Amino acid sequence: GRGMAKAYKQAVSLFESEIKNRKVKIDINERGIIISLSNDVYFKRASSDLDIDTARTVLEKISLLLTKTELSDKQVRIEGHTDKGPTDPDGPWETNWDLAAERALNVLKYLIDFGVNPANMAAVSYGEYQPIPLLNDDTEEGMARNRRVDVLILRD
């Protein structure tokens, strides 16, 4: 409805500088509003740990959107994604599912710490199996864009 369109405009305005610097991408579609965070910007390399110095402002803005606007009663799904590259055999994640799940959970935990209602939240891992449509995942840029965590604010 119209509430989602208004909230989308608020989100675009709120994240103007991050969008300009390609740190955040915002879309709206039939599922809802998607705030896409680049893993390369917000997570330490080959890690599920958020670089909180870099991520704090963005997470605070997301929590503001999810607590202080008409989106406060919406269900939110934190979706972890990876590229199709293999995980480090010596690393802590057996598969990309594990890495994406842990990243999504870490974002969820911070948002709850920043005041988002935990009853509205869920974390999901897609591993490498939901690449961005029409994006070549064989290029370095394509792989980088697929390494992301999407904060999906669901339509009713």
Q: What role is predicted for each listed range?
A:
Residues Y42-I62, T67-T69, H81-D156:
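Periplasmic OmpA-like peptidoglycan-binding domain that tethers envelope proteins to the cell wall
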Residues N21-K23, D73-Q75, P118, N146:
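Short secondary-structure junction motifs
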Residues G1-I34, S38-D40, K44-A46:
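Juxtamembrane linker/hinge segments adjacent to a transmembrane helix in small membrane proteins
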Residues N29-E30, K74-Q75, G85:
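Short acidic/polar alpha-helix capping motifs at helix-coil junctions
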Residues I26, K74, N136-D138:
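Residue-level detector of alpha-helical recognition elements and their boundaries
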